[in-house]
Amino acid sequence: MNRKQHFRPHVQGESLENKINQLGDEVFEALLPSMVTFAASVFIWMIYLGFLPVSLLSAVFMTILLVVFSVRAFAKIRKLNRQIKNHRKGLDGERYVGTKLERLSSNSTFVFHDVVCGKFNIDHVIISTKGIFTIDTKNRALPDRDYNKADFIFKDGELIDSTGVLQSDLMHKIESQGRWLEGKINEWTKKRYPVYRVGIMIGAYVNNINKDFSKYWIINDGAFAGFFDKEREKFPLNDVLRIADSLQRFIEKPIA
């Protein structure tokens, strides 16, 4: 597992942090036309008021242009700010869970963060003699509910929130992550290893109706470590080292 110094793995939430920075750039780009038009409008009005000859029509035109650009910029920035807020909440969740997962690291348990897989990324991956896990974290604002009522109900591979809405997109994402890693491991080792699909719902009460954790672990942030500790040893250490090294080679990237 020793790697060259000019390579580094992703850190917790790196993809989300990059998205936040990109959205910040888009906010500036949205403001730029308004700022330029504002400066031009002030300049033209100063001219119209007596410094240099200019028509009233030009001043009015620039003012209208400023209003149009400002309204468009306001609408776009409002949307971007919502996205930034959601990404920051997700980033906080990823880092919070990632810090807890790091405590599980050992000579037989390897924790990876922000594994980029083309169109999507996996928040965390654990490669261990106790099993292989893809982990997706959700840090959502939870609606008010009765004390004994679950925030999420998991049954027969389906996840339903407390308002009765089926979380099919989330389950599809969790399934896709596990299937992707299973395929990659098979590609690297020419063997098939089962992967647990984990969804960590931060601060939520999740009711697993069937008590079936053979494939999916839809649990809250306080439960994962306990579930993991109770798992029996499944894979030889040499297999784990080989898979972990292959994954590290896949996710590492050069430092510019």
Which residues does each predicted region cover?
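Phosphate-centric recognition/catalysis
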Residues: 123
